[in-house]
Structures are given as C-alpha cells and as structure tokens.
C-alpha cells in the first residue's frame, strides 16, 4: 500500500524540520502513539494503538533513520509487530520539505507499507481509509503545534 500526502505549514522550513525530525515533538501528533524512546543513534522504538474495523490493537515498532539531508529530506524504515504477533508491518517512508517562502513550507510525505497477518487480510479500501484518516489527524495536530508555537 502506498500513502502520499502533501500539505503546507505556515512556518519557516528550518522550524518545520526541527519539529518534524524530533521524536519527542512529533510523537504526540501521531494518532495512537503512546510513547517514543531512543534506543540507539538514529534508532527509536514506539507503541502505537490503532483501530481497523472492529479490531483494536497495538503495534510495537522500531524506527530507523536511513538518511537525513537537513532541512529538506529524510527517509525512515519502520518495522513492527502487533501484540501476539498476529500481524507485522514494514514501511519505508520519505519526507521532503520545500520552502514556499520565508514563512511557509510544503511537506510531502510518502510511505510504502507492507502489512501481513490478520490485519493484512482486510480489504485495501478499508486500510486506505484508516491510513487516510490517521494522516489527516496527524496533519491537523502537526500544523497546530508548529503554527501555534511560531506565534508565541
């Protein structure tokens, strides 16, 4: 499954980069993210609760930073298992920041996701709807945090 989102944040690119590449800052913006901890250089672990159809579950995920080119590009690999190991997820994500002007930044996010196990059996349509909803909630929370912080 491929996810691609593009949105604008009213803040300078350096501010967006600093926020979005800080796990402590960005984690509260991710729907269902309970905690994030650094487990090594450029390596993080998180717990994420999600709901897909009638199933509520939690994934334990490991995130590795594959590449960073501040303040314009980063790529990540995420791997995780659902509690009870009923499902596995693997994703490669890319984040690009483009300066629109000194006060606005375009964010482009793409992710190739492979989900196997019981959750992988859900129809592609349902998975896309869940991913889209999570993405929209993330964008709203991220904008609020960055744009409100920029006003103070």
What function would you assign to each model-found segment?
Residues 118-152:
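A conserved amphipathic terminal alpha-helix motif
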Residues 6-10, 37, 64, 96-98, ...:
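Generic structural detector for well-ordered beta-strands
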Residues 38-81, 137:
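Glycine-rich portal/gate segments that line the openings of hydrophobic small-molecule binding cavities
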Residues 12, 41, 70-71, 100-103:
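Short strand-connecting beta-turns/loops that link adjacent beta-strands
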Residues 62, 80-129:
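Beta-strand/loop substructures that line and gate deep hydrophobic ligand-binding cavities in soluble
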């Amino acid at each position: 499954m491929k996810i691609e989102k593009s949105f604008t944040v009213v803040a300078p690119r350096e501010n967006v980069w600093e926020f979005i590449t800080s796990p402590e800052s960005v984690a509260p913006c991710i729907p269902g993210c309970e905690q994030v901890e650094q487990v090594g250089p450029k390596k993080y672990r998180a717990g994420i609760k999600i709901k897909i159809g009638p199933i509520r579950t939690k994934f334990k995920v490991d995130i590795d930073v594959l590449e960073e080119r501040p303040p314009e590009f980063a790529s990540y690999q995420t791997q995780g298992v659902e509690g009870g190991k009923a499902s596995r997820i693997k994703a490669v994500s890319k984040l690009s920041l483009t300066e629109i002007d000194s006060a606005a930044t375009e964010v482009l996010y793409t992710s190739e996701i492979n989900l196997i196990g019981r959750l992988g059996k859900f129809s592609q349509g349902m998975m896309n709807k869940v991913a889209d909803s999570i993405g929209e909630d993330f964008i709203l929370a991220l904008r609020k945090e960055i744009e409100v912080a920029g006003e103070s």
